[in-house]
Amino acid sequence: MKFTKPNSRQNKPHVEQKTSRRSTNANAVASKNVKKVTEAQPKSVKASTHSVKPTVKNPLVEGEKLQKVLARAGQGSRREIEAMIAENRVSVDGKIATLGDRIDVHAGVKIRIDGHLINLLHAQKEVCRVLMYYKPEGELCTRHDPEGRPTVFDRLPRLTGSRWIAVGRLDINTSGLLLFTTDGELANRLMHPSREVEREYSVRVFGQVDEAMLHRLKKGVQLEDGPANFKEIKFAGGVGMNQWFDVTLMEGRNREVRRLWESQGVQVSRLIRTRYGNISLMKSLPRGGWEEMDLTNVNYLRELVGLPAEVETKLDVTKPRRRAKTGQIRKAVKRYAELNKRYKK
């Protein structure tokens, strides 16, 4: 009789092989899953580490446009500053600026125009100033004339740290109301056609004018730079071939009033701007004279173009100083009068 051992290979050899194969397959699948997890994990960790990496701010990419900041600081209108940038006259932190550059005013950037450092923080504290000027005929709306002819800037009060910016232009043969401001953004918005700020002119024309012509001028005519028209035309007097009209426009293109009349075969012999928005030319203002606007008128212009109102103007800031100076002058005059009386006795 033969006996077999209970733990010998002859007992359940097939079952043992199946078990080992199943365990091997399970281990292989588990190792594959672990491998997939371990392979996917570093990628997510890497991505998260990359996302929390601190970004370095570039003052030339973030912030406001350079020309807008300089315009608000009273260095000129946006158009003037864009011309300066194009001429390589503006630098930011020692590098020549280009159109499209943006800056963060509070980042401590150093901006220079023609080598002169611009104090932006000081300019932000300055209040907005607006002048009404009665431009006479014969003056140019430019800062410098190579021929030495008089300009509208010659008679204006001197400024330190900023400059007067003309709100639009009047040609050499046109007189009347011209606004100046120290806020380039205000000037830019007032001049922009999208704001549709009314300009009123008193115009004397030479030629035959009839109702059909006035109707065409109000409906619109085609000029070389596009269609144009008067919003309003009112007869203001005159006889024969010389007649006066009050006309209103919603934009200020170059010589637009003259060109509109000339398109109908009529010549303009006199042109005076009398109103800009609701600001009318003061009758008491002499030709070549200027008057600084009060807070009410300054804020009217700012709100007209969507800018925040000012709390005070230069007139309010300097009022105590001017009052003290006036008092000193009065005392000096009184003292002088008393000395004269004593001397005569």
UniProtKB/Swiss-Prot annotation:
Region (Disordered): 1-60
Protein name from the UniProt record: Ribosomal large subunit pseudouridine synthase B
UniProt enzyme class: isomerase
GO molecular function: 23S rRNA pseudouridine(2605) synthase activity; RNA binding
InterPro entries assigned: PsdUridine_synth_cat_dom_sf, PsdUridine_synth_RsuA/RluA, PsdUridine_synth_RsuA/RluB/E/F, PsdUridine_synth_RsuA/RluB_CS, RsuA_PseudoU_synthase, S4_RNA-bd, S4_RNA-bd_sf
PANTHER family given in the database record: PSEUDOURIDINE SYNTHASE FAMILY PROTEIN-RELATED, RIBOSOMAL LARGE SUBUNIT PSEUDOURIDINE SYNTHASE B
The reaction(s) this protein catalyses: uridine(2605) in 23S rRNA = pseudouridine(2605) in 23S rRNA
Highest rank taxon of the organism: Bacteria
The species this protein was found in: Pasteurella multocida (strain Pm70)
Gene3D superfamilies reported in the protein's UniProt record: Pseudouridine synthase, RNA-binding S4 domain
Biological process, per Gene Ontology: enzyme-directed rRNA pseudouridine synthesis
Keyword list, A-Z: Isomerase, RNA-binding, rRNA processing
Biological role stated in the UniProt entry: Responsible for synthesis of pseudouridine from uracil-2605 in 23S ribosomal RNA.
Domain S4 RNA-binding per the UniProt entry, residue ranges: 64-136
Biased composition (Polar residues): 1-10
The enzyme's E.C. designation: 5.4.99.22
Family stated for the protein in its record: Belongs to the pseudouridine synthase RsuA family.
Catalytic residues identified in the record: D171
Pfam families noted in UniProt: PseudoU_synth_2, S4
